[in-house]
Amino acid sequence: MRIDILSKEYPPAIYGGAGVHVTELVSALRARGDLDVRVHAFGHPREEDGTTGHPDLTELTGANAALTTLGVDLSLAAACEGADLVHSHTWYANMGGHLASLMGDIPHVLTAHSLEPMRPWKAEQLGGGYRVSSWVEKTAYEAADAVIAVSAGMREDILRSYPSVDPERVKVVHNGIDSELWQRAVDEDVVRRHGVDPDRPSIIFVGRITRQKGLPYLLRAAAELPPEVQLVLLAGAPDTPEIMAEVESLIETLRETRDGVVWVPTMLPRNEVVAMLSSA
């Protein structure tokens, strides 16, 4: 059985949780040994066997990001010819999965990591493209053969956002974790290198700078932390310049009244994230 997985993110280009999810899913499916798992990701060519990168169409250079995305989706759909099942992740790849399903008369499964109707602030990022991304998602969800929600709450949100979707087609499959990779591992050298004092208590945030993560709320609340507590932020990949500016301003204000505010704006290797989490 051939399964084609479509995703905007895939190593080495990962900036959020959906990319991590897809990476682990592909690894687990390929480990079975009885499936032909192919990955179609946005961006540059990949060296991994069975994985293809699909760059932006040069004809759409400078266009709204939503239109650029649709250009890549056409490439994804064409590449899925011959697949038995297509599985797409996030609105970026959903239209690729939908078109592949129509062209090949094959099942389309999609996993819901977020929902466009619940992220109206994305109009800051995409402008009119937000209406396009919302249309893409609605079209794909209503036509999909199955929709995977990563939580019961997400399932409720899907059915509320898209009431015409048959509830029987929406299944919950919770996100998992590789407990062998994410073992506690103290490494004070790594912690100190990033400016954290391992002898002081700390609270840590790991995630993208995006509205749904609620980082500005944390930064405002952090003013109430005991003075000996450090606030460690492993936060980058902002959705928009506006939220980046807001976070930068809040961090600057917080640092005026307390020390121990550590911000690492780059994405760290997993072993360093483990070390930072282990010190919190």
Language-model regions: role of each:
Residues S88-A93, A112:
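Short His-centered aromatic/hydrophobic patch
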Residues Q183-V196, V247:
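A short helix/loop element that forms part of the nucleotide-sugar donor recognition site in Leloir-type
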Residues M1-E47:
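N-terminal subdomain of nucleotide-sugar transferases
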Residues R200, A235, M244-N271:
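Nucleotide-activated donor-binding/catalytic signature segment of Leloir-type glycosyltransferases, i.e.
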Residues G153, G176:
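Carbohydrate-associated surface elements
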Residues P107, P117-T139, E156:
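Nucleotide-sugar donor phosphate/pyrophosphate-binding loop at the beta->alpha transition
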Residues V20, P201-E224, A245:
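A conserved mid-protein helix/loop that constitutes part of the nucleotide-sugar donor-binding site
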Residues V274-A280:
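Short alpha-helical donor nucleotide-sugar binding micro-motif in glycosyltransferases
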